[in-house]
């Protein structure tokens, strides 16, 4: 007999995941899978940097267990330098503020384990990435309390009233809010005023503020205005007395650097020693020594300038422009993206569940796979996340297949 924790996972969560993500191949067509938010536009350059780092720095000591509380010191120093250079913290980040984890999901799970007792809640605005359900609920047994915010208010000061309402009406105790900035799947950033308002909400209600900033450097120029919209890290705002012990940032190399398989995430918290030490304890030796060897080279300022400033932003902007024109030419509603690897768009006309199921079936026949907004806990039908962080020729093929699916759906309705 399995434990009660495991029984819930096998009876509820695993069947749901199989229903949502299983999609067989359509005939002889290789399906273009745009359901995973992976960054492929830097793959070649990142691979070159990793090969170079291993060739220069790998030695026999790296085959031993990792050393250091919270991860290898050299890697944590590089992360601290990167955050100080790129995230504009109000207080300088030191290696002692960082715990390394095998990915951002593990970082979130670790934070929730220390913040929430089983059955306690975390406020998250919908739509949100469904992987958070796994990170927060499967092991820590916390509960997500969904905050439904209209899209036109999602990044506005008026959004705070929805958090207040969710807190007031929650049937379970709330211990934290979790923000994704830049946002997945909406592809926008929160401005400084909204961040300050949300911090004030947390301070008034004694809630932890967790900021998932894994897309922090995947900010690209606005196609219409030719400017780079600002990403504001929560590290630049947690300045009120006593607030730093309640504010925690999560980062990972996976999205910005296009290396999800390396499994390197980080918890950054600057005023909560107990949480840091507890996190270091349960993540001890979980990050590979090989990954730790790579990090200092990958985060070296010369490398980040080339990868992020010169290559990533221009390539994401180019591909976003392709998707934007495709949607505009078809008269489809979408959330204009400024950051991230995707666009959130409504591909339906009638916006019914029947049409959404038909769209999914037609896309399968056309050889393309998207994730529906309902999988992100969005209440409206026919919204999909279109991932565009692929080689530009593949983006062209994907858009052609999506267009074919839309045409077929319209004929069948």
Swiss-Prot record:
| UniProt entry keywords in alphabetical sequence | Aminotransferase, Pyridoxal phosphate, Transferase, Virulence
Quote the EC number.
2.6.1.-
Q: Which cofactor does it need?
A: pyridoxal 5'-phosphate
Transferase: is it a keyword of this entry?
Answer: yes
A GO molecular function term, named singly, is: transaminase activity
Q: Does the keyword Transferase apply?
A: yes
Superkingdom, taxonomy of origin: Eukaryota
Explain what induces or represses this protein's expression: Expression is co-regulated with the other genes from the sirodesmin cluster and corresponds with sirodesmin production.
- Give GO terms for biological process: amino acid metabolic process; biosynthetic process
Q: Which residues carry this modification: N6-(pyridoxal phosphate)lysine?
A: 255
One Pfam match, given by its short name, reads: Aminotran_1_2
Q: Which SUPFAM superfamilies match?
A: PLP-dependent transferases
**Broad enzyme group:** transferase
Tell me the route in metabolism or biology where this protein functions: Mycotoxin biosynthesis
Q: Which family does it belong to?
A: Belongs to the class-I pyridoxal-phosphate-dependent aminotransferase family.
Q: Please give the function described in this protein's UniProt entry.
A: Probable aminotransferase; part of the gene cluster that mediates the biosynthesis of sirodesmin PL, an epipolythiodioxopiperazine (ETP) characterized by a disulfide bridged cyclic dipeptide and that acts as a phytotoxin which is involved in the blackleg didease of canola. SirD catalyzes the O-prenylation of L-tyrosine (L-Tyr) in the presence of dimethylallyl diphosphate (DMAPP) to yield 4-O-dimethylallyl-L-Tyr, and therefore represents probably the first pathway-specific enzyme in the biosynthesis of sirodesmin PL.
Q: What is this protein called?
A: Probable aminotransferase sirI
The species this protein was found in:
Leptosphaeria maculans (Blackleg fungus)
- Which lineage do the record's taxonomy fields give for this organism? Eukaryota, Fungi, Dikarya, Ascomycota, Pezizomycotina
Gene encoding this chain? sirI
């Amino acid at each position: 007999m399995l434990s009660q924790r495991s029984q819930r996972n096998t009876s509820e969560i695993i069947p749901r995941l199989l229903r949502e993500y299983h999609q067989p191949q359509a005939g002889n067509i290789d399906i273009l899978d745009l359901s995973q938010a992976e960054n492929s536009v830097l793959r070649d350059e990142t691979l070159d940097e990793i090969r170079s780092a291993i060739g220069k720095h790998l030695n026999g000591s790296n085959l031993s267990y990792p050393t250091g509380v919270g991860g290898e010191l050299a890697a944590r120093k590089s992360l601290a330098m990167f955050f100080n250079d790129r995230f504009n913290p109000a207080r300088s980040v030191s290696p002692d503020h960082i715990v390394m984890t095998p990915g951002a999901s593990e970082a979130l799970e670790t934070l929730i384990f220390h913040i929430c007792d089983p059955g306690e809640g975390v406020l998250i605005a919908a739509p949100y990435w469904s992987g958070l359900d796994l990170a927060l609920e499967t092991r820590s047994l916390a509960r997500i309390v969904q905050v439904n915010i209209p899209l036109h208010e999602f990044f506005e000061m008026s959004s705070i009233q929805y958090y207040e309402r969710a807190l007031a009406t929650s049937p379970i105790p709330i211990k934290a809010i979790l923000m994704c900035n830049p946002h997945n799947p909406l592809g926008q950033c929160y401005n400084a005023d909204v961040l300050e308002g949300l911090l004030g909400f947390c301070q008034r209600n004694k809630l932890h503020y967790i900021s998932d900033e894994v897309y922090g450097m995947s900010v690209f120029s606005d196609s219409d205005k030719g400017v780079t919209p600002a990403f504001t890290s929560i590290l630049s705002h947690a300045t009120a007395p006593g607030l730093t012990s309640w504010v925690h940032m999560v980062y990972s190399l996976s999205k910005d650097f296009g290396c999800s398989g390396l499994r390197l995430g980080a918890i950054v918290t600057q005023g909560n020693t107990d949480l840091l030490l507890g996190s270091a304890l349960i993540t001890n030796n979980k990050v590979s020594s090989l990954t730790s060897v790579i990090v200092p080279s990958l985060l070296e300022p010369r490398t980040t300038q080339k990868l992020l400033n010169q290559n990533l932003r221009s390539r994401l902007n180019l591909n976003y422009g392709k998707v934007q024109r495709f949607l505009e030419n078809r008269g489809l509603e979408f959330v204009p993206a400024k950051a991230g690897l995707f666009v959130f768009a409504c591909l339906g006309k009638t916006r019914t569940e029947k049409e959404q199921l038909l769209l999914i079936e037609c896309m399968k026949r056309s050889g393309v796979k998207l994730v529906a907004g309902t999988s992100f806990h969005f209440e409206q039908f026919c919204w999909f996340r279109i991932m565009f962080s692929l080689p530009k020729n593949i983006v062209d093929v994907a858009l052609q297949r999506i267009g074919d699916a839309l045409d077929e759906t319209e004929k069948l309705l």
